[in-house]
């Protein structure tokens, strides 16, 4: 049989008719296996994550050799991992060291240097003072920032000798045989732009505080739970109380939240290191100070800014107005922790009154401050620990750290604070050790 074209038909030329596959059949044959594989992979990932969460919660993994130890063995002072990594990322005691040989005075932030030859302090003359010397002075105090300095006139009541200085990248030194200060001026030095807030507080009495009034306040949290307050000193460092960390020594479980007056309403920042002052066995309530180093530096903004450290000669007389802030309990017994940052205006209480028989009976030492109100009612409670006691001159300074007290807001037992001026050298040395 031939085709119309005259060519014989060949069975091989005939294309068999195939019934098109319906979409439903294609899905059953191809889609379902793919989905099954994806779901299996997702299930495996979820199971792996759950296993990791459980392991991380109860166990620590030692690297070499691979072993598991219980979380309770972390930071217990014993090397349970062969290579000792279970004791590496722990809260560290930082001992007292020799004092830093530079300081700033409340007299116009003038720079003073310790004369190693005589053991006395001298104000620094502006003659031949350079930006390099300014950076060296600031680095001695633990500041790694661009300093600002200017000349200020020597006043007639200047009570320290005036000296020219020299130095290297490590420290300033009094220049031997330096001439008189020809410029008639001292060095006024600022190592960091600090202590500025966008709003001035106007209300008192434990009321809600806007975040831009206190942009240096942070929440320090352990396993996502607020434990203590703290104060931003610079992009890397947070100042707080040592007792916040006595029970929880694993640094990796601590986080810092900054930039919000609502508890838990800002991203958490990982912590690199925590240093606490070595405790004094004779006075266990002393040395309640700690520094937290962040893994990444803060970016300053209207709601994230540093507070100033006090000047070395800053003295607060009784009745000086100061401020306290925090997310503490609103009542002494049975109250709940505030979700909003609270502020209160208080005043410095005379240490003699604070140590009276109806108060703290001599427990308050020279390294502490008392603050409250004579009638009581405005104070700090649990949860405010580590937060700042603040004083305003031309800028805000953190003069105290919330430390301890009996009750909350009692008229005879005001709050007790770590006196920051007593620990300036400790702060300088800790920061300098990490530069």
From Swiss-Prot:
Residues 52-435 are extracellular. It is a single-pass type II membrane protein. Glycans are attached at residues 128, 176. It is found in: Cell membrane. This is Transmembrane protease serine 4. Residues 1-30 are cytoplasmic. It comes from the Eukaryota. Pfam families: SRCR_2 (PF15494), Trypsin (PF00089). CDD domains: LDLa, Tryp_SPc. Keywords: Cell membrane, Disulfide bond, Glycoprotein, Hydrolase, Membrane, Protease, Secreted, Serine protease, Signal-anchor, Transmembrane, Transmembrane helix. The active site is at residues 243, 288, 385. Disulfide bonds join 62-81, 75-90, 125-181, 138-191, 194-308, 228-244, 354-370, 381-408.
């Amino acid at each position: 049989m031939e085709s119309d074209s005259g060519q014989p038909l060949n069975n091989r030329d005939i294309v068999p008719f195939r019934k098109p596959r319906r979409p439903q059949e294609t899905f059953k044959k191809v889609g379902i296996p793919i989905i099954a594989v994806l779901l299996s992979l997702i299930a495996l990932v979820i199971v792996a994550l759950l296993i990791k969460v459980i392991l991380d919660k109860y166990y620590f993994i030692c690297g070499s050799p691979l072993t598991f130890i219980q979380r309770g063995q972390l930071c217990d002072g014993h090397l349970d991992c062969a290579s000792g990594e279970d004791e590496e990322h722990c809260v560290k005691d930082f001992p007292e060291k020799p004092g830093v040989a530079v300081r700033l005075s409340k007299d116009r932030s003038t720079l003073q240097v310790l004369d190693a030859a005589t053991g006395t302090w001298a104000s620094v003359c502006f003659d031949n003072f350079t930006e390099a010397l300014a950076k060296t002075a600031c680095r001695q105090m633990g500041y790694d920032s661009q300093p600002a300095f200017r000349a200020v006139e020597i006043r007639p009541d200047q009570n320290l000798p005036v000296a020219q200085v020299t130095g290297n990248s490590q420290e300033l030194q009094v220049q031997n045989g330096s001439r008189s200060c020809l410029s008639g001026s001292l060095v006024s030095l600022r190592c960091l732009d600090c202590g500025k807030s966008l709003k001035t507080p106007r209300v008192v009495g434990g009321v809600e505080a806007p975040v831009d009034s206190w942009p240096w306040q942070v929440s320090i949290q352990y396993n996502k739970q607020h434990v203590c307050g703290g104060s931003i000193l610079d992009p890397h460092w947070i100042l707080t109380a040592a007792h916040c960390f006595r029970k929880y020594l694993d640094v990796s479980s601590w986080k810092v939240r900054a930039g919000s007056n609502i508890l838990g309403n800002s991203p958490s920042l990982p912590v690199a290191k925590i240093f606490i002052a070595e405790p004094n066995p004779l006075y266990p309530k002393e040395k309640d100070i700690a520094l937290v180093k962040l893994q990444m530096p803060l970016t300053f903004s209207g709601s994230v800014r540093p507070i100033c450290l006090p000047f070395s000669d800053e003295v607060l007389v009784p009745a000086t107005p100061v401020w306290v802030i925090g997310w503490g309990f609103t009542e002494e017994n049975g109250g709940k922790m505030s979700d909003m940052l609270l502020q209160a205006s208080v005043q410095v209480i005379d240490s003699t009154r604070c140590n009276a028989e109806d108060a703290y009976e001599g427990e308050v030492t020279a390294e502490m401050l008392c603050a409250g109100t004579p009638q009581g009612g405005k104070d700090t409670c649990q949860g405010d620990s580590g937060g700042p006691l603040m004083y305003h001159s031309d800028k805000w300074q953190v003069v105290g750290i919330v430390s301890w007290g009996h009750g909350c807001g009692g008229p005879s037992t005001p709050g007790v604070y770590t006196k920051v001026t007593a620990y300036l050298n400790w702060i300088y040395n800790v920061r300098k050790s990490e530069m």
